[in-house]
């Protein structure tokens, strides 16, 4: 599947120091050593209701990491998936009378257009679940052969043969096992907390025939009226959610890759189970670090499809709003915090953008180098975008207070820095 096209990123003098991020799996900050090679996997959308502000905030957050690495002279391998077949997509297609493939294609196109408008750097590989089924099937077959997956007898009216991952068996390792996954390794949650979230986030803890309530689906055998694909010894069907990302990451990235990213709602079960699948398949951890973006609400309320209060990037753009201002409104909040989109906050972002542009024409001589150093220091510290924005604010105030003409060299350098590090074009 093709990705969108990235805009050129200006090259700046000097380099970003090694980036420190908060690692969810260890509950502490970790420094990402500047080894020269970095790798990033960010879980993509299920293509319906794209692109809401929660989506946008998550991809802008990890775009900051991508940019910070590149500014530090690192080569970055970046992969993003798209879950282009899943229950929510099929349910929306049925409810609206649209073929699920057409719905997915239109929403993927809209998402990519929004990402390009927000100046999010494109992944090197943008990979759909459907196109990955030929690799997913043998991975599930291997888990069956290893005794880490099992088939479930169908309930009345349902077919036999759905395949589930055995989390208890997968959590058992020899004393020599290195960096072995066990249930809770990523999330750090109690079983009670896991059960609650599992039911809320696509799991089926009450499914009869499962060995453990938290066992996730690997393969759903074919049902009438649902799309299905050849599954070898699994029978016709379609993959579960978590195994898709594991297989895609293992195909395109080193093992372990540097950072697994996504929204905080993916910590459990998605990232937890994906990490388990990876270790079960290869004996190697999926990722070295796990980082997560906060949730976005609207005017203090949870933003959700069911409430119908989604703020869509495409609707803002259609109303004539500038994508750079949308991006600035997102960057005003630290990526790990939960926050709400408000009209007041968006107005502040538009004012800030205008003030930066006004100040650019008055850029004081030899001011750019200090600003770049301050921005890099903030972004290297757990991608502290609000701190970087505050540094530009201070520079803009000083620029407006100076007498005389601005420096063309510093004007160009500040413009390049705000673009390269924050993804905002002045």
UniProtKB/Swiss-Prot annotation:
Its cellular-component GO annotations read:
cytosol
Molecular functions per Gene Ontology: ATP binding; cysteine-glucosaminylinositol ligase activity; cysteine-tRNA ligase activity; zinc ion binding
GO biological-process terms attached to the record: cysteinyl-tRNA aminoacylation; mycothiol biosynthetic process
What's its top-level EC category? ligase
Keywords of the record, alphabetical order, are: ATP-binding, Ligase, Metal-binding, Nucleotide-binding, Zinc
EC number(s) in its UniProt entry?
Answer: 6.3.1.13
Q: According to the UniProt entry, where does the motif 'ERGGDP' region sit in this chain?
A: 200-205
Q: Name what cofactor the protein needs.
A: Zn(2+)
Matching entries from InterPro entries are given as: Cys-tRNA/MSH_ligase (IPR024909), Mycothiol_ligase_MshC (IPR017812), Rossmann-like_a/b/a_fold (IPR014729), tRNA-synt_1_cat_dom (IPR032678)
Q: Where is this motif: 'HIGH' region?
A: 45-55
Q: Ligase as a keyword? A: yes
Which transformation does this protein catalyse, written as a reaction? Answer: 1D-myo-inositol 2-amino-2-deoxy-alpha-D-glucopyranoside + L-cysteine + ATP = 1D-myo-inositol 2-(L-cysteinylamino)-2-deoxy-alpha-D-glucopyranoside + AMP + diphosphate + H(+)
Name the family. Belongs to the class-I aminoacyl-tRNA synthetase family. MshC subfamily.
Mind telling me which HAMAP family this protein's record contains? Answer: MshC (MF_01697)
Q: How does it assemble?
A: Monomer.
- Extract the NCBIfam families matched here: mycothiol_MshC
> What protein name applies here?
L-cysteine:1D-myo-inositol 2-amino-2-deoxy-alpha-D-glucopyranoside ligase
């Amino acid at each position: 599947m093709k990705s969108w096209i990235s805009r050129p990123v200006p090259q700046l003098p000097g380099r970003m120091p090694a980036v420190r991020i908060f690692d969810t799996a260890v509950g502490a900050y970790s420094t990402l050593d500047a080894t020269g090679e970095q790798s990033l996997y960010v879980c993509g959308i299920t293509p319906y209701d794209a692109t809401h502000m929660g989506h946008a905030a998550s991809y802008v957050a990890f775009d900051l990491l991508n940019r910070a690495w590149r500014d530090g002279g690192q080569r970055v391998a970046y992969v993003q998936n798209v879950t282009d077949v899943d229950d929510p997509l099929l349910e929306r297609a049925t409810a609206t009378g649209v073929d699920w493939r057409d719905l997915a294609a239109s929403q993927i196109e809209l998402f990519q257009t929004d990402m390009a408008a927000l100046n999010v750097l494109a992944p090197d590989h943008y990979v759909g679940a459907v196109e990955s089924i030929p690799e997913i099937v043998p991975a599930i077959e291997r888990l069956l052969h290893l005794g880490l997956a099992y088939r479930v007898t169908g309930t009345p009216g349902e077919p036999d043969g759905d395949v589930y991952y055995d989390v208890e068996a997968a959590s058992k390792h020899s004393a020599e096992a290195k960096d072995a996954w066990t249930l809770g390794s990523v999330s750090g949650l109690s079983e009670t907390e896991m059960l609650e979230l599992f039911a809320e986030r696509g799991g089926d803890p009450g499914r009869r025939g499962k060995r453990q309530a938290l066992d996730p689906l690997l393969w759903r055998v074919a049902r009438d009226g649902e799309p299905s694909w050849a599954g070898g010894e699994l029978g016709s069907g379609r993959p579960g959610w978590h195994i898709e990302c594991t297989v895609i990451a293992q195909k395109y990235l080193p093992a372990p890759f540097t950072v697994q990213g996504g929204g905080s709602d993916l910590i459990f079960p998605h990232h937890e189970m994906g990490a388990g699948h990876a270790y079960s398949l290869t004996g190697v951890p999926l990722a070295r670090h796990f980082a997560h973006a906060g949730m976005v609400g609207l005017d203090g309320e949870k933003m959700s499809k069911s409430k119908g209060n989604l703020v869509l990037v495409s609707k803002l753009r259609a109303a004539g709003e500038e994508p750079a201002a949308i991006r600035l409104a997102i960057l005003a909040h630290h990526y790990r915090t939960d926050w709400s989109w408000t009209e007041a906050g968006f107005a502040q972002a538009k004012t800030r953008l205008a003030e930066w542009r006004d100040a650019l024409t008055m850029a004081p001589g030899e001011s750019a180098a200090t600003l770049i150093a301050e921005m890099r220091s903030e972004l290297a510290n757990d991608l502290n975008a609000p701190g970087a924005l505050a540094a530009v604010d201070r520079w803009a105030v000083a620029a407006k207070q100076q007498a005389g003409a601005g420096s063309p060299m510093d004007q160009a350098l500040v413009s390049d820095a705000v673009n390269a590090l924050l993804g905002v074009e002045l």
